[in-house]
Amino acid sequence: MNTQEIINLIANSKKRTIAKAYVSGNLKNIKLENVEFVGNELFGVLFGDLKDIENTINKNDIKNYKIEILAKNSAIPLADIKKYNARIEPGAIIRDMVEIGDGAVIMMGAVINIGAVIGEKTMIDMNTVIGGRAIIGKNCHIGAGSVIAGVIEPPSAKPVMIKDNVMVGANAVILEGVEIGEHSVIAAGAVVIEDIPPYSVVAGVPAKVIKKVDKKTESKTQIIDSLRNLK
C-alpha cells in the first residue's frame, strides 16, 4: 500500500466513535442494534459505535448505564495483536495493517502506525514512535523515545527504511525517506536527515558519520537473543 492509497483509505473510511457501556436492568430479552453484548439478565457490557450503543440503551429496559468513549471519529482500527508471533507489552498501540515479524518485541508505550513493517527479532523500545509505512529490518533495536518518521503527512513517496542489525539509540530521530544501512549504529539523540552507509556509526544534529563499526562498537551494541524468547 503506497502513501496515497493509505491517505485515501483514511479519508474515505467510515469514522467510528468506539465506546463501551456498562448497563443494568431487565436484560433477559435485550434487543441489540449493531452492538456486542456480554453479560447476564441483570448486568452486562455493550461494545460498538456510540450511536448504536445509545440506540440500544434507548430501546431496552435499561435502568442504569455508564458509557466510556475509547476513540472519537476513528478512521482506522487497532490491530488484532493475537495474529502476531511476537512479545507485545501492555500499553503498546499498534494500528491495523502493520506487519510484525516472528520474535519481535514491542515495549510499553510504543506507537506503530498504519503500513509499518517490523522485522523478525527487532525490539521497539518504550515510547518509540514508528510512523506510517516505515520499514525496519531484522534484529534491530530502536531505542526508547526514538521517532522514525512516517510518510502519511506530509506525504512522501519513499518511506524510512532501516536495514537489518541496526542499533538506534534513545531519542534519535530519523526523517522521512532516509535509508539506514545494515549493521549501522545511530547514537542517542541523533537527528538523521540523509542516507547512512552500512556499518557506519553516526552522531550529532544533524547526524554525521563519525567512524565505521568496529569490534568495540559491536560489543557495546549487542542484540540479546534471550530477550526475544517467546517460551
UniProtKB/Swiss-Prot annotation:
SUPFAM superfamilies (alphabetical): Trimeric LpxA-like enzymes (SSF51161)
Pfam families (UniProt xref): DapH_N, Hexapep
E.C. designation(s): 2.3.1.89
Enzyme class: transferase
Reactions mediated catalytically: (S)-2,3,4,5-tetrahydrodipicolinate + acetyl-CoA + H2O = L-2-acetamido-6-oxoheptanedioate + CoA
Associated pathway: Amino-acid biosynthesis; L-lysine biosynthesis via DAP pathway; LL-2,6-diaminopimelate from (S)-tetrahydrodipicolinate (acetylase route): step 1/3
Keyword vocabulary terms for this entry: Acyltransferase, Amino-acid biosynthesis, Diaminopimelate biosynthesis, Lysine biosynthesis, Repeat, Transferase
Domain of life: Bacteria
GO biological process: diaminopimelate biosynthetic process; lysine biosynthetic process via diaminopimelate
Entry annotated with the keyword Repeat: yes
A molecular function GO annotation: tetrahydrodipicolinate N-acetyltransferase activity
Annotated family: Belongs to the transferase hexapeptide repeat family. DapH subfamily.
Function summary: Catalyzes the transfer of an acetyl group from acetyl-CoA to tetrahydrodipicolinate.
PANTHER family in the record: 2,3,4,5-TETRAHYDROPYRIDINE-2,6-DICARBOXYLATE N-ACETYLTRANSFERASE, ACETYLTRANSFERASE
The protein's name: 2,3,4,5-tetrahydropyridine-2,6-dicarboxylate N-acetyltransferase
